[in-house]
Curated annotation (Swiss-Prot):
It is found in: Cell inner membrane. It comes from Rhizobium etli (strain CIAT 652). Keywords: 4Fe-4S, Cell inner membrane, Cell membrane, Iron, Iron-sulfur, Membrane, Metal-binding, NAD, Quinone, Translocase, Transport, Ubiquinone. It is an enzyme of class 7 (translocase). Its EC number is 7.1.1.-. Belongs to the complex I 20 kDa subunit family. GO terms for cellular component: plasma membrane; respiratory chain complex I. This is NADH-quinone oxidoreductase subunit B 2.
Length: 167
């Protein structure tokens, strides 16, 4: 029974449909305009004319219901983490998360009881963009890594993917 399902899943029809679906998903990433701290300034500058994320198909959206990418850019406190999780839950499937900056990845220099030590404790993070704050080029590289991850996924088979760390 398992070999028949694998043969159907790996057939030409499904792999072609997967590649078309993944191409369209990776070519139109709509991140939510959501910045918490100083990394948000670099995220804003990445959307301006000098770096122009629009050429990668990245268009910032004002609502979580219109977004498929969440960029956590900055320090998340324990009081604010449920709000971020609620915004994540309001996003339609499929959805991805980019943790931008040292504070979003590991809590940064704020090793206190009030700061969450990493965004992966309350949302699944797909791409990590390190830096304090990371340059707009690093965020662009993170989007390119996310696009490659989406292209490698199997949309119709439902295969889970590994997490990616931008270096």
């Amino acid at each position: 029974m398992g070999t028949v399902n694998n043969a159907i899943r790996d057939s030409v029809l499904f792999t072609t449909a997967d590649s078309i679906i993944n191409w369209s998903r990776s070519s139109a990433l709509w991140p939510e305009t959501f910045g918490i701290a100083c990394c948000a300034i670099e995220m804003i500058s990445a959307g301006c004319a000098r770096y122009d994320l629009d050429r990668f198909g990245v268009v910032f959206r004002p609502s979580p219901r219109q977004s498929d990418v969440m960029i956590i850019a900055g320090t998340v406190t324990r009081k604010f983490a449920p709000v971020v999780r609620r915004l994540y839950d309001q996003m339609p499937e499929p959805r991805w998360v980019i943790a931008m900056g040292t504070c979003a990845i590991s809590g940064g220099v704020y090793n206190t009881y009030a700061v969450v030590q990493g965004s992966e404790t309350f949302v699944p993070v797909d791409v990590h963009v390190p830096g304090c704050p990371p340059r707009p080029e690093a965020l662009m590289h993170g989007f390119l890594l996310l696009q490659e991850k989406i292209k490698r996924s199997r949309a119709l088979a439902g295969t889970p993917l590994d997490r990616v760390i931008a270096s």
